[in-house]
Amino acid sequence: MAVKADPGGFPQRKTSESRWVTAAQMRDVQRIAQEEFGIDILQLTENAGRSAATLALAMLGGKGRGQRVVILCGNGNKGAAGLAAARHLSNWSVRVDPIVSGVEEEAGFTVRRQLQILRQSGIIEPRDMESSDITVEDQLAESDLVIDALVGYGLEGPPQGIAAAVAQLAIDAKRPTLALDVPTGVNATTGEVSSPAIKACTTLMLDLPKKGVLQDQARNHVGELFLADLGIPVGVPERMGIPMGGLFSEGPIVRLRR
């Protein structure tokens, strides 16, 4: 079954209906949510993962059985969201191949927690995190969909090290790709495209839309645009002068049309 970049069935909004934020503004929103409202980062990554899994399943035609999804995960919170998505997709009968681009001992707390959950659930074994380039190439070639959860919105400049190598493998594989927040290699604030940069058919932005995604230079890398509510109280961005305007009044995932 062909992957649908815009599977339909989600509420639609115009891009002009929302305030688009920089990476710095997004950091402030998350900081206030955590420090003043007690929102835990594990909550945010879990919500992001479920949203990613929901959209991925829709892109696959709404049926998980017989589908294979490779999830490229970094060592930070975005990678943790990708691992959470792997668990949900596995629950929905999708065959998942989560790949962490780094040494587990050096990964952030949220990644290690999600890996622990996946292992306890029997979804992955420790050796699955030690794939060689050849194994990753094979997994990508056999996938129906790739989820890009390699680097977060705060990255400036090109991806480095293992993340760059994995991104290049994904680019070479030319599989339909769902990017979380912004595709790897695209600057969330300016839209500048580095090398390597993943070319997504669909981008699911998280909580607030990022300015860089709308820029002309990023258009060929972001594909169709969606936005997911992560559960941050609307009062947090609004007190920073970022009105939400009932953006999620019809559902937690919305399709954004230019």
Predicted regions and their residues:
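YjeF_N-associated NAD(P)HX repair module
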Residues: A2-V21, S143-R258
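A cross-family phosphate/adenosyl-ligand binding-site feature
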Residues: A2-L145, V151, L155-G161, R219, ...
